[in-house]
């Protein structure tokens, strides 16, 4: 495996960029070229989830390979107190709707995928939901809604029986305490929430699309933690780097196109310790019920925290 890793590292450190520029617009200032201008711009959290990123997000993250198992584990845990056909679920920060669709496949009563990005939601409605080819009843149980999870007024009191915050959703919130309070307001008594977190010091920050081995983390076979991803796609070259300045973190992405234009974007997170999230949730009224280890879903050092509304 160490030998294969060295081959992979050499391949992706030296491979020439190739492909076509699609879904990327540079800004013409008149002072410098478009490609030069593009190198100076950074897309931040509130800007980067646009049509271009929505179109490539699933290929980059490849969450479709992990979510079926993760969703099944969550629903199995929820089954201890509720039946599938009684669940009214909120998928908070649903993105392109992959997890939303997998929840619907479980035969839940209804599910709303909430996201603040209109572009990601269009992708969810027009691509993910269509490609899923759900039976009519399951398809009709799905709704996607543009809204802010950090605003209590987004939903009514007790509107849902369950909620899920998957992938890095919790880390995008600048006010997790307020978010837990909102969820406590939206979920009726007896309901539950599932919140995905990671061990920020040990989880694998490499994107699945950048790994040379499907379902296998390179972290076990390298002396130093691998924090960079590099992938060659047909239409652009992609690089990413995870940088932890505890408790803050950045995930920086760079897309390079054949016309020499560049798109740079920076995800900023507040990565509190797992015990801090449990404390914040408890302070908002939630009862901590334990966690699900996602190693069986192919994600080491990632966990789903389960909380119950008393």
Tell what function each PLM region has.
Residues 8-84, 86-95:
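Conserved class I S-adenosyl-L-methionine
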Residues 151-157:
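Short conserved loop adjoining the S-adenosyl-L-methionine
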Residues 161-175:
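A short SAM/SAH-binding and catalytic strip from SAM-dependent methyltransferases
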Residues 177-189:
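A short glycine-rich, Lys/Arg-flanked "PGG" loop and its adjoining helix->strand segment in the class I
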Residues 194-279:
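SAM-dependent methyltransferase
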Residues 270-310:
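C-terminal lobe and adjacent flexible extensions of AdoMet/dcAdoMet transferase-like proteins
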């Amino acid at each position: 495996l160490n030998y294969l890793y060295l081959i992979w590292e050499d391949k992706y450190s030296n491979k020439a960029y190739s492909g076509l520029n699609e879904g990327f617009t540079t800004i013409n200032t008149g002072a410098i070229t478009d490609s030069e201008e593009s190198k100076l711009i950074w897309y931040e959290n509130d800007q980067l989830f646009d049509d271009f990123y929505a179109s490539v997000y699933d290929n980059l993250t490849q969450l479709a390979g992990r979510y079926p198992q993760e969703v099944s584990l969550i629903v199995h845990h929820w089954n201890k107190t509720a039946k599938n056909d009684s669940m009214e679920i909120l998928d908070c920060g649903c993105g392109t709707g992959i997890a939303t669709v997998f929840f619907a496949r479980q035969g839940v009563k209804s599910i709303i995928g909430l996201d603040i990005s209109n572009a990601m939601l269009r992708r969810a409605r027009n691509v993910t939901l269509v490609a899923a080819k759900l039976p009519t009843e399951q398809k009709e149980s799905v709704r996607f809604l543009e809204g802010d999870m950090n605003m209590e007024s987004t939903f009514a009191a007790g509107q849902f029986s369950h909620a899920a915050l998957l992938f890095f959703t919790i880390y995008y919130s600048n006010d997790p305490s307020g978010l837990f309070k909102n969820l406590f307001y939206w979920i009726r008594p007896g309901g539950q929430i599932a919140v995905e977190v990671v061990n920020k010091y040990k989880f694998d920050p490499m994107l699945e699309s950048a790994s040379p081995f499907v379902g296998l983390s390179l972290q076990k076979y390298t002396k130093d933690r691998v924090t960079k991803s590099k992938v060659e796609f047909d239409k652009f070259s992609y690089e990413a780097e995870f940088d932890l300045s505890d408790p803050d973190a950045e995930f920086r992405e760079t897309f390079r196109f054949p016309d020499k234009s560049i798109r740079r974007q920076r995800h900023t997170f507040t990565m509190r310790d797992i015990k801090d999230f449990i404390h914040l949730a408890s302070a908002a009224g939630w009862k901590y019920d334990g966690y699900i280890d996602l190693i069986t879903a192919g994600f080491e050092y990632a966990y789903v925290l389960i909380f119950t509304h008393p």
